[in-house]
Amino acid sequence: MKKTFLPIFLVILLASYALANPQVTFSRDWGPGKK
């Protein structure tokens, strides 16, 4: 169970970071610091 849960969690975390990264880089006003 843990061997399958870890990779899935890692992929979700990576996808979330990849989705948030370009938004923060392209527009600072839309970043997590400013809502």
Swiss-Prot record:
GO molecular function: hormone activity; toxin activity
Modified residues (Pyrrolidone carboxylic acid): 23
Record's keyword terms, sorted: Amidation, G-protein coupled receptor impairing toxin, Pyrrolidone carboxylic acid, Secreted, Signal, Toxin
Keyword Signal: yes
Residues found modified as Proline amide: 32
Predominant subcellular localization, coarse grouping: secreted
GO CC annotation terms, alphabetical: extracellular region
Signal peptide interval: 1-22
Subcellular location(s) of the protein: Secreted
Tissues with expression: Expressed by the venom secretory cell of the spine. The spine is a cuticular structure containing a single large nucleated venom-secreting cell at its base. It is an independent unit capable of producing, storing and injecting venom. On the back of D.vulnerans caterpillars, spines are grouped together by 50 to 100 to form scoli, of which there are eight in D.vulnerans.
Other information: Extremely abundant peptide in the venom (almost one-quarter of all toxin-encoding transcripts, and the highest represented peptide by proteomics methods).
Listed name of the protein: Z-limacoditoxin(1)-Dv1
